[in-house]
Amino acid sequence: MSQEFDYIIVGAGSAGNTLATRLTEDEGVTVLLLEAGGPDYRFDFRTQMPAALAFPLQGRRYNWAYETDPEPHMDGRRMECGRGKGLGGSSLINGMCYIRGNAMDYDGWAKLPGLEDWSYLDCLPYFRKAETRDIGPNDYHGGDGPVSVTTPKAGNNPLFHAMVEAGVQAGYPRTEDLNGYQQEGFGPMDRTVTPNGRRASTARGYLDVAKKRSTLTIVTHALTDKVLFEGKRAVGVRYLVGAAEERVEARARKEVIVCSGAIASPQLLQRSGVGPAKLLESLDIPVVHDLPGVGENLQDHLELYLQYACTQPVSLYPSLLWYNQPAIGAEWLFNGTGIGASNQFEAGGFIRTRPEFEWPNIQYHFLPVAINYNGSNGVKEHGFQAHMGSMRSPSRGRVQVKSKDPRQHPSILFNYMATEQDWQEFRDGIRLTREIMQQPALDAFRGREISPGIEVQTDEQLDKFIREHAETAFHPSCSCKMGTDDMAVVDGEGRVHGMQGLRVVDASIMPIITTGNLNAPTIMMAEKIADKIRGRQPLPRSKAPYYVAGDAPVKGKAMRDVSAVAQ
C-alpha cells in the first residue's frame, strides 16, 4: 500500500498540529499527519477536565511513560519522562500553564550564528498569532488565534493571592502578566483552557479547524518506523498501523517534517540512519548521514515541592476525597465551571537567586493543595505548596536509540544536577522559598512545613533531599538543536543539516531551554517555521517594550527577614 502527499508530518502534537493546520490553508497543498496514539476523546474527563491533569500521567493510553537510565547524580534513580501520546501530543496531557519564556531567552538565541531572526521581537508576533486571550488582545497578546488562553478570575482561591503577596513582601517585584512586559516577579498565571472550562490542546484549537479540509489526512495509531531516503533526500516514511501493525509506505513530494518531540524525534532520525555514525553502526543501522548532534544537548527543568499545612479549610484537599468528586465533575461537565475547570496553577513567579543571573533562573508554580504532580502522595489534610525549579541548568544529557524496533523506548539520560551551579541554585531556591513562605501574607494560612521539613537545613541535608525528591517538570528539549556549529542538527528554519526535504520542528530544536513551560514556545516556533515553509514574509517585528533587569537588585528588603540564604 502506498500513498503520496506534499508533506508528511510525523507527530500530531503541539508543533505537528500547528504545521498541519497552517500548511493546508494553502489551496491544493496535501498533508499526511501521522500520530502513534489515538484520538483526543472529548468525553474522557482525564484529558478534557483541567483539574484532572494528573490522570493521563498515571497510565499509558495517553502517555509514552518513558523512564530515564539511572541518573548518576540522583542516587541512581530511574526518573519519569512522561510524553503525550494521542492527537494533541503533550498538549493533551500537560499542566496547561501558558508561559512563553523570558524575552532574554530569545535574544540569547538570536546571538547564535544563523539564528539572528529568533529574537524576542521577531517571536512575539507569532505568540500573538497563535493566541486568543479571554480578556482581549494587546501589544503582547492575541485575540483571534487557535489557542484559548484563560486568565485567573476574581473569587478564585485565596491562597493564590496570599502566595503572590508573600513573594512581594519578600522583596520581589509584582507583575500583572508573566507573558507581558515583565516576566520577573510574582503574579497571576494564564492557562490553556477554553472559555467553557475544557483543555485547550492543539487538537482542539488547530485540528478542529483543519480536519474539515479534504487536503488533510490524519492517521491515528500509526507508529512511524523510519524516514525513507533516496540518497540524502527524504522521500517518505514507513509506518505501522493499528494492532496488526500493517506496514504502510507514504511518499512526500516536498518534505518530511518530524514533530515527534525531544525524545522521539532524535530516536526516529537515528533509527532512519541520521545521527552519530558510531551509535548507528553499533546497531547495524545503515548510515545515511553522520550527524553527531542528533540526540545530544538534551535539557529539562527539574523541580521540587515545598509543602505546608494549611490552618484554614480553604485548600483543595476536600476535592481529593472520592465522595466530593461526582459533584465537581457534574458542575464541570454541565456548566464548565468550578474546581474542575481550572488546572489550579493560577499563580506563580520568576526570580533571580544571585546577581550574576541576568534574568530569572528560578520558576514558581503555586498550588492550593499538597500533592505530587502525578497525583500521588497527596497529604491527607489541608495544605498548599510551591513548585520550585531551576530554569537553565548547565547539565546536558542525551537520547540514544537502542534498536531498529520502533516499539522499543530509547536510552534517555538527562544527567540532572551534574554541575555545582545546579546544587547552588536549588539550595538557594529552597532557602529563598522558605523566606517567602514566612512572610505576613501567609500568617493566616501557614501551618507546619511538611516537606522538606524544618529539620532539613544544612547544605548536606538539602542535597540529600534534592537527590531523593526532585522530579522532572516534563520539559525535555534541545536534543536536535538549531544552529551552525558541529553539534547543531537543524538550521534556523528546522532543515536538517546535510539533508534535503527533511525538517524537525518541535521543542527538540531549541538551542537552549527557555525560562518556563514549553508548550507556548513550541507552538510559536511551529507558527514561525510554517511561514518559512509556505514562502510567506515573516510577520513584522514587534515594537513592544520589554523588561531587562540590568543593574536592578535581585530583591529588595523583605518585610520579615528570616535570614533565608546562608552565606
UniProtKB/Swiss-Prot annotation:
Enzyme class: oxidoreductase
Gene Ontology, cellular component aspect: membrane
Pathway per the UniProt entry: Amine and polyamine biosynthesis; betaine biosynthesis via choline pathway; betaine aldehyde from choline (cytochrome c reductase route): step 1/1
EC number: 1.1.99.1, 1.2.1.8
GO MF: betaine-aldehyde dehydrogenase (NAD+) activity; choline dehydrogenase activity; flavin adenine dinucleotide binding
Record carries keyword Ubl conjugation: no
InterPro entries linked to this entry: BetA (IPR011533), FAD/NAD-bd_sf (IPR036188), GMC_OxRdtase (IPR012132), GMC_OxRdtase_N (IPR000172), GMC_OxRtase_C (IPR007867)
Keywords tagged on the record: FAD, Flavoprotein, NAD, Oxidoreductase
Biological process annotations from GO: glycine betaine biosynthetic process from choline
Gene3D superfamilies (alphabetical): FAD/NAD(P)-binding domain (3.50.50.60), Glucose Oxidase, domain 3 (3.30.560.10)
Cofactor(s) the protein needs: FAD
Pfam families given in the database record: GMC_oxred_C (PF05199), GMC_oxred_N (PF00732)
Recorded catalytic activity of this chain's protein: choline + A = betaine aldehyde + AH2; betaine aldehyde + NAD(+) + H2O = glycine betaine + NADH + 2 H(+)
Binding of FAD, residues: 6-35
Catalytic machinery residues: 475 (proton acceptor)
NCBIfam families: betA, PRK02106.1
Family: Belongs to the GMC oxidoreductase family.
Cross-referenced PANTHER family: CHOLINE DEHYDROGENASE, MITOCHONDRIAL, GLUCOSE-METHANOL-CHOLINE GMC OXIDOREDUCTASE
Its biological purpose: Involved in the biosynthesis of the osmoprotectant glycine betaine. Catalyzes the oxidation of choline to betaine aldehyde and betaine aldehyde to glycine betaine at the same rate.
Name of the featured protein: Oxygen-dependent choline dehydrogenase
Lineage: Bacteria, Pseudomonadati, Pseudomonadota, Gammaproteobacteria, Pseudomonadales
Gene behind the chain: betA
